[in-house]
């Protein structure tokens, strides 16, 4: 089926484009959702000597945010693209720095990020997320109208042939040289991300744990599970009253993670694989084989078959609650049939009434997880691009990208070009870059930005 935008004439598309305010709409959304953003940046502990500072922290941080929103890949490209008077004028309004008369140099930004504690930017992100959580407009996305869905997943960021820093993770790969197999070391940096589901199409960074070795003398790499324990412990302190449903792939479907969730009163929906929890898998199959599973046919988008068994942990001799459920359906091709099957573990009591919503929640994790990281890696942000070789600056660049992504997701959900003509994310960012470089923000625009506005998201 064609999308709405495919039926529009070119003339109608041009008419929709005329309604686009470009960078002014981004500024309006920042004012609407994060009115004190520049203040939050300026309240960070400034690592610079006061007598040597020309730019405020908000000047520097917001320039980094705009670099990401406008899909500018490199620091050099930012230097060239942002050297325009409208950029200076717009950044002055965003940061509130009336003395700003020139864009900061990219080296100035990198030098600042080399010294700034990543906890400072993480704290700004926390304030942004709490501001969004308080808004009732996102409540409809809670699971059963109660639990905020938090998805955790790890991804690789940077890879090096030689040791980059003392915190590098290391792996050994086999490659062929002169007809012989040679084992060589490769060094890399990895991150564990917790994403908060606010609405369809809006899944924002909630917290980040960098997976790294404490020093170069450790005998074993830091791993995702250890990082997950640190991240979940911090989430419990930062959001002590937030009703959470944790979601993750089969890597996290282990008792230590489930125990942490139970200790904090959280729910969990974790992908199940027999290779990860063999005893549970065997007991589920044994109970189902004896007719102990509840089955519902014709559910889900594909009208497939759902099945569940509560408290499999009792027969498996496990401590943590393991209510298990699955969903399977067939797709037909040219004379062939393909079976698709998914299975999850949860501590939510399963019933015939809630099974379909639980299936949609479980399947949604994969889509959100892959779209989120795929867009950041291969879309407008290209988080694997090295903006600095300094390990501290690398972390801060990553966190600035997460802050920018929160703003950008809100804009994409609001943008008339996305909603009206289905413009791609990359083209939307390109138009924002041109708007930032060419559009003069007028007094009328400032009035539009600062007055109370009802914002309708897709």
Question: Residue spans of the language-model regions?
Answer:
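Gly/serine-rich nucleotide phosphate-binding loop at the start of the catalytic core
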Residues: 27, 32-103
């Amino acid at each position: 089926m064609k999308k709405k935008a495919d039926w529009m004439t070119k003339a109608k598309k041009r008419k929709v484009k005329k309604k686009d305010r470009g960078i002014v709409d981004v500024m309006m959304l920042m004012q609407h959702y994060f009115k004190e953003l520049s203040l939050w940046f300026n309240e960070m502990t400034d690592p610079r000597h006061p007598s040597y500072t020309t730019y405020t922290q908000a000047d520097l941080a917001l320039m980094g945010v705009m670099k990401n929103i406008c899909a500018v890949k490199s620091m050099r490209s930012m230097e060239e693209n942002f050297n325009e008077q409208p950029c200076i004028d717009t950044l002055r309004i965003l940061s509130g720095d009336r003395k700003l008369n020139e864009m900061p140099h990219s080296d100035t930004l990198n030098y600042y990020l080399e010294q700034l504690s990543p906890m400072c930017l993480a704290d700004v992100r926390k304030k942004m997320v709490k501001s969004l959580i308080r808004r009732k407009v996102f409540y409809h996305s809670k699971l059963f109208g109660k639990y905020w869905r938090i998805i955790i997943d790890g991804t690789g960021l940077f890879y090096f042939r030689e040791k980059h820093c003392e915190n590098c993770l290391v792996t050994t790969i086999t490659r062929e040289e002169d007809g012989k197999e040679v084992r060589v070391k490769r060094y890399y940096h990895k991150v564990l991300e917790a994403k908060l589901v606010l609405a369809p199409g809006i899944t924002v960074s909630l917290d980040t744990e960098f997976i790294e070795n404490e020093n170069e003398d450790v005998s074993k790499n830091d791993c995702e599970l250890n990082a997950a324990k640190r991240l979940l412990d911090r989430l419990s302190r930062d959001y002590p009253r937030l009703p959470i449903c944790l979601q993750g792939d089969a890597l996290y479907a282990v008792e230590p993670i489930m125990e942490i969730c139970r200790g904090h009163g959280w729910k969990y929906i974790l992908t199940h694989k027999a290779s990860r929890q063999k005893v549970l898998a065997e007991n589920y199959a044994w109970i189902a084989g004896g007719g102990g599973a509840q089955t519902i046919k014709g559910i889900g988008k594909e009208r497939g078959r759902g099945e569940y068994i509560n408290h499999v942990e009792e027969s498996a001799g496990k401590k943590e609650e393991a209510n298990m459920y699955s969903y399977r359906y067939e797709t037909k091709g040219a004379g062939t049939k393909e079976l698709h099957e998914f299975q999850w573990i949860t501590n939510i009591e399963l019933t015939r009434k809630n099974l379909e919503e639980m299936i949609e929640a479980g399947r949604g994790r994969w889509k959100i997880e892959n779209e989120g990281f795929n867009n950041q890696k291969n879309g407008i942000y290209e988080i694997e691009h090295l903006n600095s070789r300094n390990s501290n600056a690398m972390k801060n660049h990553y966190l600035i990208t997460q802050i920018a992504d929160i703003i950008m997701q809100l804009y994409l959900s609001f943008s008339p070009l996305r909603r009206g003509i289905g413009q791609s994310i990359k083209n939307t960012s390109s138009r924002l870059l041109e708007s930032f470089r060419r559009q003069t923000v007028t007094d009328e625009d400032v009035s539009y930005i600062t007055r109370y506005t009802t914002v309708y998201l897709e």
